[in-house]
Regions:
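Active-site-proximal cap/loop segments of hydrolase catalytic domains
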Residues: 1-142
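C-terminal, loop-rich substrate-recognition/catalytic regions characterized by aromatic stacking residues
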Residues: 115-210
Length: 210
């Protein structure tokens, strides 16, 4: 909208189908059944699980209505994601890479989203971001590093708010891994022996269906 001056998608969702209800091609609507039961609003809430049952494959509903038009986002943006959640990082990091904003910041933290959002330091940062763009305050926000990462260390304290020039890191070494169903492992080389595994995939709180 023309009046929108800045946005701060913290722990965002930008593609409902690919990031949430059918990640990896596996339908999973149970989590949203729980959300519908927990969230009470006067005018109701969309039943995403029911829509997944109605439209199990990618179509205009998922791609037009439930996927962000990244190219249309041009306002200053402050995005936040984490390494520790399996819900929001995909959507947030995809948005970071694809939005058209020239003024954008990314912070990847090392905790769960709710404690991070309530940390005084980061609440103050968010206030500075909005005050800078909505009120025109000269508070030094533009000097904030464009990208800050967290490095998780299982043997010691994590490194937090590490400034880097860009993300993904330019010297990232992307490697392809191959499934080995027989050994239930990942291998560096393509597998020459055919193997398979089967499993039951069922929604939360339901009985297995053969």
């Amino acid at each position: 909208p023309p009046h929108l001056a800045a946005i701060a998608p913290w722990e965002a969702c930008s593609d409902w189908y690919r990031d949430q209800v059918c990640r990896g091609g596996i339908p999973s609507g149970g989590f949203f059944d729980e959300l519908v039961n927990m969230l009470r609003v006067p005018n109701g809430i969309e039943d995403i699980h029911a829509m997944l049952d109605r439209f199990p494959y990618i179509n205009e509903y998922w791609d037009k209505e439930k996927r962000v038009a990244f190219q249309n986002i041009r306002v200053p943006t402050y995005l936040v994601a984490s390494w520790t959640s399996n819900v929001h990082p995909y959507g947030t990091l995809r948005a970071w890479n694809r939005i058209s904003s020239k003024e954008k910041w990314l912070r990847i933290h090392n905790t769960q989203e709710w404690p991070d959002q309530q940390t005084p330091k980061y609440r103050d940062e968010l206030r500075d971001f909005y005050n800078h763009y909505l009120r025109g305050e000269d508070n030094g926000w533009e000097k904030t590093p464009k990208v800050r990462l967290s490095l998780l260390d299982p043997m010691g304290p994590d490194v937090v708010d590490l400034p880097v020039e860009e993300f993904p890191l330019p010297d990232t070494d992307y490697r392809r891994l191959y499934l080995n169903a027989e050994e239930q492992s990942l291998a560096w080389e393509p597998q020459t022996v055919e193997s398979s595994r089967s499993y039951h995939c069922r929604p939360l709180n339901t009985e297995p269906v053969d």
